[in-house]
């Protein structure tokens, strides 16, 4: 059989474009001046991540790239001589033993939960094992690479081997730091690890998970060919310092008692100790910020400051602007990020004037009593710095009276608790800081028309009830049952694609959708015959799931995902896609231009393979470091999240016929029983924290699609919430695209839970356009809803019209 395995031009270009900017996603947490190294040398390399390098998380976030450069490979390719390889042989033996026991227990747990083992196993990760192996390798320098992986379907635990370091890791890291003059602790992780036992280590690099060139990027950093310039988008602290979340593991209800005090808003306001604060990050070089100048033109605020490289190596710095608001009727965090900007690469001695801007209405607080966004009278302190812990007062903006910036309405339900509130604290004006008067009349109150007229296309109006309903359900096989009914028909036209919209209504185009927030996720190889395109091997399940299955089950999944092995003589075609950095790493760059270039990479590959909608980016908030899917998400801060999602969307949608699907809308901040868990969140916290990033992304980039989340919000499934979908998303944010559900809702909820799954008829009634990936049961449910009056045929045709218009726009009819 002929196999076209030579790397395609797009692969080479994309990998080259990525690698030169990857150091910008990494965060130098500690340094003593002993790095970078002058040249490749003999390097003692320890830790699971040297050989088992993690490029990204598990689940829908996995990307089928042609290869990954491990840290071992990247260092060897850069000319290093690695020692300590016998350590890895011993580690693999310890890991294999632990993994067998892990799988055995997993099968027992799936049976107890009455869940399909494949779906139950999604995201389940074995903790790092303990071991006792000698550290007898010599070298001019040494590294220890801590790796952690997490994923869709399961949350992290505060146990050793996950959020906490194992005893073995702590012992070896401290021993190596003592033994070697030049030692670097490298963190190949997607989320926070409690580093409190090893804070004495002199050099720590958060490498993160950078996609295909993860190993090469580390080699560049160790040799000084690239300089880390990332900043933390999540507060790193000892586990005990985070807000208590006693019901995080509750099957049915999750109460967001901390309200708006998420991440640094909590740590700063309540004076909690962070190991490394939000916005923090060092460089091989040093920078000095000049005195900031602040101007206000009505509600528009502009901040200018000069950044000078005072060190000996070229590098980049991130300027961060924070706003401290007066506490009046509403309590307020100590400070909130309101703008940021990254310098270009500055040579030693070079300086750049950086300009950041924001508007005061963007920083308004939500008053649930009056259902309005307000700016209260008082002083607003503008702070400028390089992290939330390193800011300098730059100006006081004084507002003479309270103003309303947007009159909304409460639509998200209520909770059975009162949000955490901050103690009242008077803000004193810093001496020597200019005071700028803000004219209240310059801030205009925005009003919203919630009674919007929706269009029904003539061709949709002419459809039968049955055909109109089909357009709201993903393409499904009416004869398939069980798991195959949802995923057995995925990717009819593009092998390995997640699924498609309905392709059986005459004269209506369909949309092809693909997963993979860290790149496009398609089948690696396929072939064509008279019956169509067929994936070679398994195209349905990520590698992280396949490794859990027995031999016979792997064969079954392979046959479902493709057609097994192709006949002799068939040409094997490839669909290798580029694995970009995980969402958190992208955000750590604080570089929206780079993120947009990553979107351009994805968009070009979508065009190349014929994919219309990318089921990404994901911009949920890092509410808790325990969320297993945080690696996909950008930050604990909504401004960072929204700006990054907008940049990614602009990059993708610059390509003809390509769109993003921003997700998961909203309050999807844990994975355990995610399809039937009720997030209980106040209207204020939802609007100021969990919805704000979506609003930024919609207003700045108009993504083609929005995906609702699995969970309920205050007792109503998000996909069934007309307040979320129509009132806030469409009316307040001005959204113009289509709304789909998250995928494979049936069969994924714990049978012991108190809440049901979302249903197609109620999703349609709320204004949801697509129930994905769809099966006959969902279709029948929608028809039943039309007949019972749960949803009107008019609403169904309104939703269907949006789907048809989007399909035409992206298929270029």
Question: What are the roles of these predicted feature ranges?
Answer:
Residues 1-365, 374-390, 407-813:
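Glycoside hydrolase catalytic-domain context in secreted enzymes
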């Amino acid at each position: 059989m002929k196999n076209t395995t030579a790397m395609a031009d797009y692969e080479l270009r994309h990998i080259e474009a990525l690698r030169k900017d990857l150091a910008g996603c990494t965060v130098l947490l500690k340094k003593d001046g002993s790095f970078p190294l002058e040249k490749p040398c003999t390097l003692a390399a320890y830790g699971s991540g040297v050989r088992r390098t993690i490029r990204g998380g598990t689940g829908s976030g996995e990307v089928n790239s042609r290869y990954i450069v491990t840290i071992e490979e990247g260092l060897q390719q850069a000319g290093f001589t690695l020692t300590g390889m016998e350590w890895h042989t011993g580690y693999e033996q310890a890991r294999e033993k632990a993994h067998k026991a892990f799988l055995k227990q997993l099968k027992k747990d799936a049976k107890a939960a009455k869940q399909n083992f494949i779906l139950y196993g999604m995201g389940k990760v074995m903790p790092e094992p303990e071991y006792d192996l000698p550290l007898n390798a010599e070298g001019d320098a040494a590294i220890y690479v801590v790796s952690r992986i997490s994923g869709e379907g399961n949350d992290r635990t505060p146990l050793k081997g996950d959020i906490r370091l194992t005893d073995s890791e702590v012992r070896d890291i401290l021993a190596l730091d003592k033994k070697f003059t030049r030692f670097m602790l490298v963190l190949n992780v997607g989320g926070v690890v409690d580093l409190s036992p090893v804070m004495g280590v002199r050099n720590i690099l958060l490498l993160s998970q950078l996609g295909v060139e993860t190993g090469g990027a580390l080699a560049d950093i160790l040799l000084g060919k690239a300089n880390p310039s990332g900043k933390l988008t999540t507060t790193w602290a000892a586990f005990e310092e985070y807000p208590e979340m006693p019901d995080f593991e509750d099957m049915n209800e999750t109460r967001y008692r901390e309200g708006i005090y998420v991440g640094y808003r909590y740590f700063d306001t309540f004076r909690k100790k962070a190991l490394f604060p939000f916005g923090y990050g060092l460089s091989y070089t040093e920078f000095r910020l000049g005195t900031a100048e602040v101007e206000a033109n009505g509600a528009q605020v502009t901040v200018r400051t000069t950044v000078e490289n005072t060190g000996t190596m070229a590098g980049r710095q991130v300027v961060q602007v924070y706003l401290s608001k007066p506490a009046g009727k509403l309590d307020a965090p100590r400070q909130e990020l309101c703008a940021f900007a990254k310098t270009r690469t500055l040579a030693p001695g070079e300086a750049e004037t950086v300009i950041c801007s924001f508007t005061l209405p963007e920083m308004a607080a939500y008053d649930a009593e009056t259902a309005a966004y307000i700016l209260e009278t008082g002083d607003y302190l503008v702070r400028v710095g390089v992290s939330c812990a390193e800011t300098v007062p730059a100006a006081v903006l004084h507002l003479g009276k309270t103003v309303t910036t947007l009159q909304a309405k409460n639509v998200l339900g209520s909770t059975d608790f009162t949000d955490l509130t901050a103690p009242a604290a008077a803000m004193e004006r810093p001496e020597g800081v200019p005071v700028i008067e803000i004219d209240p009349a310059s801030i205009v109150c925005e009003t919203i028309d919630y009674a919007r007229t929706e269009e029904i296309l003539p061709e949709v109006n002419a459809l039968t009830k049955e055909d109109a309903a089909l357009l709201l359900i993903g393409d499904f096989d009416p004869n398939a049952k069980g798991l195959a009914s949802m995923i057995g028909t995925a990717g009819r036209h593009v092998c390995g694609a997640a699924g498609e919209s309905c392709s059986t209504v005459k004269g209506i185009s369909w949309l092809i959708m693909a997963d993979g927030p860290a790149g496009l996720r398609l089948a690696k190889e396929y072939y064509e015959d008279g019956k169509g395109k067929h994936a070679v091997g398994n195209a349905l399940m990520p590698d992280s799931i396949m490794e859990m299955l027995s031999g016979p089950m792997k064969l079954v999944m392979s046959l479902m995902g493709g057609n097994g092995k192709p006949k002799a003589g068939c040409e094997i075609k490839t669909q290798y896609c580029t694995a970009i950095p995980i969402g958190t790493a992208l955000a750590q760059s604080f570089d929206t231009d780079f993120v947009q270039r990553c979107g351009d990479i994805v968009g070009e590959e979508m065009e190349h393979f014929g994919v219309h909608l990318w089921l990404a980016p994901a911009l949920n908030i890092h509410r808790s470091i325990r969320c297993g899917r945080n690696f996909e998400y950008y930050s604990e801060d909504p401004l960072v999240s929204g700006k990054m999602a907008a940049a990614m969307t602009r990059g993708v949608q610059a390509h003809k016929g390509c769109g993003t699907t921003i997700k998961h809308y909203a309050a999807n901040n844990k994975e355990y029983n995610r399809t039937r868990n009720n997030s209980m969140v106040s209207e204020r916290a939802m609007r100021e924290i969990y919805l704000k990033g979506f609003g930024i992304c919609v207003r700045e980039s108009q993504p083609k699609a929005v995906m609702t989340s699995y969970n309920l919000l205050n007792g109503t499934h998000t996909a069934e919430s007309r307040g979320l979908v129509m009132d806030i998303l469409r009316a307040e944010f001005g959204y113009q695209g289509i709304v789909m559900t998250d995928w494979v809702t049936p069969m994924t909820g714990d049978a012991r839970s108190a809440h049901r799954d979302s249903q197609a008829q109620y999703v349609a009634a709320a204004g949801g356009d697509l129930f994905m990936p769809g099966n006959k049961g969902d279709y029948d449910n929608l028809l039943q809803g039309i007949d019972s009056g749960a949803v009107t045929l008019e609403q169904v045709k309104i939703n269907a019209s949006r789907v048809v218009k989007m399909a035409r726009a992206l298929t270029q009819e």
